[in-house]
Structures are given as C-alpha cells and as structure tokens.
From Swiss-Prot:
The gene is trhO. HAMAP family: TrhO. GO terms for molecular function: oxidoreductase activity, acting on paired donors, with incorporation or reduction of molecular oxygen. PROSITE patterns: RHODANESE_3. It catalyses: uridine(34) in tRNA + AH2 + O2 = 5-hydroxyuridine(34) in tRNA + A + H2O. It holds the Pfam family Rhodanese_C. The keyword Zinc does not apply. CDD domains: RHOD_YceA. Catalyzes oxygen-dependent 5-hydroxyuridine (ho5U) modification at position 34 in tRNAs. One of its GO terms (biological process) is tRNA modification. This is tRNA uridine(34) hydroxylase.
Length: 319
C-alpha cells in the first residue's frame, strides 16, 4: 500500500468474547497511550468497536498487536490516510453493548445476521425491483449523505429502529431488504434482528459505507452527499464519480455539508449551517437555544448583552 500521508485513521470492530471489559479497557488504554495513538474505542463482553489515529508506524504497531491477539483473529481494519490526528485524546471505555439497540433478547451476530453483500453485489441489489434500502444510522448521519432511494426511518437514534420497523411492517413485508451503516457494526445486529422478526430476504453491506467508497469497481456510485464519521473530520467523501450535495442548511435550506453542534449545551443538536449563518443565528438551532444563558457561541465570542440583543432583533426583522 503506497503511503502518501504521514497519518492514518483506523476504523474497525469485531464481535468476539472479552471476559472482563473493564480490565481490558484499562490495559488497552495504557497500550494505546504508549503508542501515542488518539481515538475512541468501546469495549464490551461482546467485542470491540474503535476508531483511532496515529502515524503510519504507530498504527502499524497497533494493528500488529491486535492481529497477534487470538481474540481478534481475522479483524479487518479500514484505513484512511490523513495529514494529522483525527482525535484530540485517547479514550477506551467499557460498555454494556457495542451498539445501543437495548433489545430485551440481544442478538449475537455469530448466530444470526443478514447475508453479507460485497460492494458490487450491493450496488446491483440496490437497482433491483422490490428492494427496500434501509439506512441503519442516526437521522443527522442520513441528512449529510445516503444511498439514492434509501429510506430514512423517522427516528433520531439507532435504538429506535426496531420500533419503527414494527410500525412499518406492512410496507416492508415481502420485500428484499438491504441495510447499511458506516462500517458495518450496526447492521450485523440490525439485520440479524430483522431475520429473527421473520423477514426472509435480508442483506447487509459488508464493511459498510466506508468500504463501499473505497471499492475500485463501484467507486461509491449511487451514493449522494458525504459520510458522517465520529471524529474531527466529521465527513468523508464516498462517491468518486460525482459529488451531489444533499445536506440542507438548517436556517435557509440551501445546500450545505458543514455540521456544528447547537450552542446550547442542554440541546447540543447537530445542525448543518454555513459559517455566515452560524454567526447570524449564534450557532443555535432555535430562539430558545439562542437566549440560553449558557449559549457557548456567546461565551466563546465574548458577546455583550447589547450585541446579543442586536443579533436577535436582526433575526426577528428578517422573518
């Protein structure tokens, strides 16, 4: 693999048994710090889910150590080359589950999961009739980018997906169901849950959107927008053939791919907005959030009460 940039971002997961997640997390954090990696890794009894960044040498050492651990035999690393770190710190945290579905009867992907489709097969399947493409990510991820024709479930987070499926059973019954997510981890469980619910033809995009975008054959075709990632990059390109912007500015509806968090820490909603609108609307998604005494934009820019009042007046006048 020809390396052109000094840093790498690794994205990976594996469903495998980790007997003591708390102990493993503490030891793994120490190991990652010794390599000077930065990132976010979740550990549970059911496995590991991580993204981390470091130099080529640091990431090579990390991958070698993981590959030499029998628990992670066969682990696949998705690699992006970057100019610098994608994280500020290193976190390794134990969790009850790797992805938050909170099912009463959990799914073990080693026992039940949907069919794996490689990018080319997924591409062909998307073009077939009687196919339903379900985005298994959060709403703000979909809004930044998605496959053409994909359904956006009316949910805010992944754990709400099973309820949405049950509510829309009549629409989905008898259809070929395709599911996809960023790297594949959410679909391992979600597709398994669909199979358990009685859906007969369920497939998942093997390796997720990230793998699809790197595939030399499909080159990300049929994807619109960008792919949301959980690090400081926020978004990465997928479609190598054309770039269609699907994101819309929260305030004006104009094409936009720039995410910020609402300045009210009690809200913290992710909103797409231009730099101009961020300043105009004090980076707040609503009037209620703009007038919050804890508005981070106001604090960060040391705005006076008069300046805030003038900004609010300008917004009101523009309605």
């Amino acid at each position: 693999m020809a390396t052109t940039k000094p840093y790498r971002v690794l994205l990976y997961y594996m469903y495998t048994t980790i007997e003591n997640p708390e102990e493993f997390a503490a030891e793994h954090l120490e190991f990652c710090n010794s390599l000077e990696l930065k990132g976010r890794i979740l550990v549970a009894k059911e496995g590991i889910n991580g993204t981390c960044s470091g130099t080529v040498e640091q990431t090579e050492k990390y991958m070698e150590a993981m590959n030499n651990d029998p628990r992670f035999d066969g682990i696949v690393f998705k690699i992006d080359e970057e100019e610098g770190h994608a994280f500020k710190k290193m976190h390794v945290r134990p969790r009850p589950e790797l992805v938050t579905l909170r099912l009463e009867d959990d799914i073990n992907p080693h026992e039940i999961t949907g069919k794996y489709l490689e990018p080319k097969d997924f591409y062909e399947a998307m073009k077939q009739e009687d196919t339903v493409i379900i985005d298994a990510r959060n709403d703000y991820e979909f809004d930044l980018g998605h496959f053409k024709g994909a359904i956006k479930p009316d949910i805010e987070s992944f754990r709400e997906l099973p309820d949405w499926i049950r509510e829309n059973k009549e629409t989905l019954e008898g259809k070929k169901i395709l599911t996809y997510c960023t790297g594949g981890i959410r679909c391992e469980k979600f597709s398994g849950w669909l199979v358990r619910e009685g859906y007969e033809d369920v497939s998942q995009l093997h390796g997720g959107i990230v793998t699809y975008g790197k595939d030399p054959e499909v080159q990300g075709e049929l994807w619109d927008g960008q792919c949301y990632v959980f690090d400081e990059r926020i978004a990465v390109p997928v479609n190598q053939k054309e770039h269609v912007i699907v994101g819309k500015d929260h305030f004006t509806g104009e094409p936009c791919e720039r995410y910020v968090n609402c300045s009210n820490p009690e809200c913290n909603k992710k909103i797409l907005c231009s730099e101009e609108n961020e300043a105009k609307y004090l980076r707040a998604c609503s009037h209620k959030c703009r007038v919050s005494p804890r508005n981070r934009y106001v604090i960060q820019h040391e705005l006076t009460e008069e300046q805030v009042a003038a900004a609010l007046e300008k917004i009101e006048a523009g309605k």
